[in-house]
Regions:
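Basic/polar N-terminal segments that are highly enriched at the extreme N-terminus
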Residues: 1-4
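Polysaccharide-binding surfaces and accessory modules of carbohydrate-active proteins
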Residues: 7-10, 16-18, 27-253
Length: 254
């Protein structure tokens, strides 16, 4: 179930809660973990202005952004990369609104999940280029699964080149993360590998046009004091999954 109140969006599955907040034109992940109550009395505790974005030379700066793009002001792997017609590659997507929408209607262009119970639509717009970005998070009945994807609408009067458009971004605070991957080769696929990620980036990808037996898109992340999280794709194609761990004990999964 999805609930909207004040500048928050609360996304509940059977046993988990994802709590998002908007502020300063951004959307931030406030909480993701075991299911929490609908009591809103705790919200003033976390209802504050978020940090301004500084330059990439400030290694101590970081924030729990739910969507990021080139030009955010930090040195972390981002979710969206768009090249504009004039060859510039900085985007300034600003949050517009939260809406609960119906996305169970036919969606024939791409593979997609079915029987969604509710879907949150997060809309952003780049006021310089006038490009619109929409982020969708869906929940399912009696399940802890979240479905997520991004959609770019070229509402500008110029051509754009989409370099990167990842499906999900989650930030966690921990001194170290562990990434479990399923790697291999033909007839020897899905071997379990465990990667300790600290002050570095761990990434798998396929550029062959299909998911491939080299790196399965299903990955598991173990985050200190948070537990285990996993992700997978609903299609076979090129993919990339990565987790970046910083010196400041922040971890970003894309």
């Amino acid at each position: 179930m999805i609930k909207l109140f004040k500048n928050y969006a609360k996304i509940d599955t059977a046993n988990t809660t994802l709590l998002l907040a908007s502020g300063q034109g951004k959307v931030f992940k406030v909480y993701y973990g075991k299911k929490i109550k609908d009591d809103t009395s705790y919200l003033p505790i976390i209802d504050h202005d978020f940090f301004e974005l500084f330059s990439s030379t400030d290694d101590t700066y970081y924030s729990n952004m739910f969507m990021s793009c080139n030009g955010e002001g930090n040195n972390i792997e981002n979710m969206v990369r768009i090249i504009n017609e004039d060859s510039t590659f900085v985007s300034r997507f600003k949050f517009v609104d939260f809406q609960i929408v119906d996305v169970n209607k036919p969606f024939n262009e791409f593979p997609h999940t079915l029987n969604k119970e509710e879907t949150l639509e997060i809309t952003y717009i780049d006021e310089i280029t006038n490009v619109t970005l929409k982020q969708y998070i869906s929940v399912f009945k009696n399940s802890d699964v979240l479905s997520s994807y991004l959609k770019v609408e070229n509402t500008s009067n110029q051509n754009i080149n989409i370099q990167r458009l990842l499906s999900l971004q989650l930030d966690f605070e921990a001194s170290e993360a562990i990434m479990y991957t399923l790697d291999g080769a033909w007839c020897r696929e899905r071997n379990i590998n465990k990667h300790h990620v600290k002050n570095t980036i761990c990434m798998i990808e396929s550029r062959s046009g299909f998911s491939s037996n080299l790196h399965n898109p299903f990955v598991i992340f173990e985050i200190e004091n948070e537990g285990y999280f996993s992700s997978n794709l609903v299609y076979s194609g090129n993919h990339k999954e990565l987790i970046e761990s910083t010196f400041s004990y922040w971890n970003r999964f894309n």
